[in-house]
Amino acid sequence: MNITSSKWRIIILVGIVLYFIYIHQRLHIRPDHIFLALLILTLAFGKKGARKFLFDWMPFIIFWMLYDMMRGVADSWRGIIHIKDIYDAELWLFGPLFGGKIPSFFLQDFQHAIAGSGIKKIFDLAAADLYTIHFAIPLLAGWILWHTTNDRAMFYRFAYTMTILNVLALTTFFLFPSAPPWYVMRYGFAQPQGELIGAAGSLVSVDELLKVKFFTTIWDHFNPNYFAAVPSLHGSYPIVVILFMYKKFKKHLPLLLLYPILTWCAAVYLNHHYVIDLIIGGIYTLIAYLVMSKILFPFIFEKTIFRSGITATFPEKLKKEEAILAEKQVIT
């Protein structure tokens, strides 16, 4: 669709209206909803560069909307929560390596053993930092591809690998709701009843260290779905990021690999994920990449968007347009 057309703007406007109707009915309208809507409208009705930014980055915006909207449907649509089967599989696979315990519980015992020490504070802060930059790092990687290196084709491959991954993950969250290890540690294998607390896991230690309730508040009150452990997006996003950073720059692979490895360790250390969750997240990443590279990009994007020139580099197109306009002014 031509992003300069009024029809495209009408679609955006109607989409925003429907979005507000939905969240008003299922949730409650928050300031961040209003901010996001105003941002989208500003870009949609802005200059050509702004509209192209919105068009290219729309997959990330739509995912955030859908993920946030899970607050209104996750509790009412889900069936039986998978609790013991995931735990038993983790114990069977990794119990012999961790003294008959699952890795996350083994690390909880380790934390208790070093409680109050400086090394525990370092581990807690490092794990919290890695865990909380989860959503920011993919956006930074996207910005590097889209703006810094101005590689629109690579950005599309990255963005739609993320999109396919997110679609697969959201579908799984609904069809296979699964409890993380912090739930088993606090509630056992019983199905959830009423309001849940403790979703921050070992991030509570960081709150206690900093004398705040930041992580407790975020995970207990702003988490859209407590039972979205499989697949682990903390396990999959870092792989997508380092895959495309290496494809683009062809250097520093050992250093890049540290990011997913440390993030996986943080997810287990904080009692938020089983190792199985992370492995499944990695498998989902491979599937998403193959679908993007073998089907979506060659059969759709190369024959539509890139052929039409929608994703031509902004600076080059803007310079050409300015030159044409200046030439017309000189002639007149």
What are the roles of these predicted feature ranges?
Residues 1-12:
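N-terminal membrane topogenic signal
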Residues 19-31, 42-53:
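Short, hydrophobic transmembrane alpha-helix segments
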Residues 54-137:
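Intramembrane catalytic core of multi-pass membrane enzymes that act on lipidic substrates
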Residues 57, 139-176, 181-193:
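Interfacial segments of alpha-helical transmembrane regions
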Residues 140-147, 235-253, 283-294:
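Membrane-interfacial alpha-helical segments at the cytosolic side of multi-pass membrane proteins
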Residues 175-248:
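Membrane-interfacial catalytic/cofactor-binding modules of polytopic membrane enzymes
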Residues 180-183, 229, 262-287:
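Interfacial helix-loop-helix junctions of multi-pass membrane proteins
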Residues 291-327:
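Membrane-proximal cytoplasmic C-terminal regulatory module of class A 7TM GPCRs
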